[in-house]
Amino acid sequence: MSGHSKWHNIQKTKGAQDAKRAAAFTKIAKELIVAVKEGGGITDPANNSRLATVITKAKAANMPNDNIKRCLEKAAGAGGGDNYETITYEGYGPGGVAVIVETMTDNRNRTAGSMRHHFDKFGGNLGASGCVSWSFDKKGVLVIDNEDGDYDEEEVMMDAMDAGADDFEAEDDVFTIYTLPDDFNDVVANLSKYTFASAQIEMVPQNYQKLDNEDQIKLMEKLIDVMEDDDDVQNVWHNWDQD
């Protein structure tokens, strides 16, 4: 399994990512609200597994507990907040890079138009459902940043396997723990002594694709940026090998 290069890229552009923190919290807030609504209004993560998963993601992103609490109160209140639905789009970026875009929207026509526009503008094309998702695996992904050397690699690996992880990977100072989606919350609970730099369910590529053409690389970077900046977009998964 290829290294979790996205984490390295995030670190390289930390200043830019810090500027997007508020936007990231807004997206997570939307996920919290949807998790409560789709969980029958249950705000206790012990009885709402999807909510537990999103709360883990929120805490890894350093979202303040007060923010999380307000989102849960809003979701449980009268009307339950905005009426969002989750829609996933699939397509191809420049050079045939496979792209999956997860959205939460209150207007599917607006979002569908935006997705088609983004793909077309930056050298890609929007495809049919299932056109690329077959080449990805849905996994829980827990990332530990060990830049300070606080953790021993072998100990983390053994703890991860004992906790029920599906796979473990070490690259430079980053440890990545993979789980089956249904095991995610249990593995997180069993690894509570560790601090995660990120923690969520992801679509992990089965293989990666390089772009050697500089124009295609620039277009792919722009496509990812514009997708991630779209208010309706929650996650962008792709198989571009950026190393």
Describe each PLM feature range.
Residues M1-G127, V132-V141:
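N-terminal cationic and glycine-rich segments that engage phosphates or anionic surfaces
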Residues V141-D243:
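Positively charged, low-complexity, intrinsically disordered RNA-binding extensions
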